[in-house]
Regions:
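N-terminal Rossmann-like dinucleotide-binding module
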Residues: 1-36, 60, 172
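Short, Asp-centered acidic motifs that coordinate Mg2+ and/or phosphate
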Residues: 20, 40, 56, 137
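Beta-strand-loop-alpha-helix segment that lines the small-molecule cofactor/substrate pocket
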Residues: 56, 63, 68-115, 130
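Glycine-rich, N-terminal phosphate-binding loop of Rossmann-like dinucleotide-binding domains
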Residues: 60-62, 142
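Rossmann-like NAD(P)H-binding beta-loop-alpha module
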Residues: 118-140, 144-149
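Rossmann-like dinucleotide-binding domain that binds NAD(P)(H)
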Residues: 148-208
Length: 208
């Protein structure tokens, strides 16, 4: 789903010299190959890592548990990494990935796309230049359709609310730099999604 979208975007980008793709399902691999016309296509990500012509790896995989080991292997092989959220399922895994990138002088970032939203970037600019004055409170609400919630729940362990609200948290923290959160409180409520994957339908989060 998302991986195919990312591959098409990369195939059409002037910043990408050659595209190499990996997909574990042969039928999906062939489908994406037809859409993107890559230099190479494989079902084993280790073939991507072993290719000396590849300098950057974009990781967009499910389940989420695969993010850490694939990103780790890429960083150890000297590849720059753009990783879709979540960075990992455990804090120590995230810490290790960040340290690996620093130790190997590699670029490593998570695909928080709201930073490239012109409205969000404009708001950050106006906060930085003082137009909006001192920001003391930010409130964000996000609403998903039931159909999108079902689609997300079918492929990830995390709740749809958690998967989407992470974008909101990121752009708020980004806009308010260099301020950092010191306390987080969150609460959820079950509903329709509970029977699908045991996740919350609604979440409230307060960050101070």
């Amino acid at each position: 789903w998302c991986g195919g979208i990312r591959a098409e975007t990369l195939a059409n980008s002037a910043l990408v010299d050659k595209l190499h793709i990996c997909e574990i399902r042969p039928d999906r691999l062939e489908e994406v190959r037809t859409l993107t016309h890559p230099a190479t296509a494989t079902t084993d990500y280790k073939a991507i890592i072993a290719n000396p012509d590849i300098s950057v790896v974009y990781i967009s995989t499910t389940p989420e548990q695969t993010h850490y080991p694939i990103a780790r292997d890429c960083l150890k092989a000297g590849k720059h990494v753009l990783l879709e959220k979540p960075i990992s399922m455990e804090f120590w895994e995230a810490d290790e990935l960040i340290q690996l990138s620093r130790d190997n002088n590699l670029k490593f970032t998570i695909g928080y796309s709201q930073r490239f939203n012109t409205k969000v970037a404009y708001a950050k600019k106006k906060i930085a230049d003082g137009t909006l004055g001192k920001v003391v409170n930010v409130m964000v609400s996000r609403h998903l359709s039931r159909s999108l919630g079902k689609k997300i729940a079918s492929r990830v362990r995390l709740s749809p609310a958690a998967m989407e609200s992470t974008h909101d948290l990121d752009f708020v923290f980004w806009m308010l730099e260099p301020a950092k959160p010191v306390r987080v409180y969150s609460q959820g409520a079950y509903g329709y999604m509970k029977e699908l994957n045991g996740s919350y339908d609604t979440m409230w989060t307060t960050v101070t």
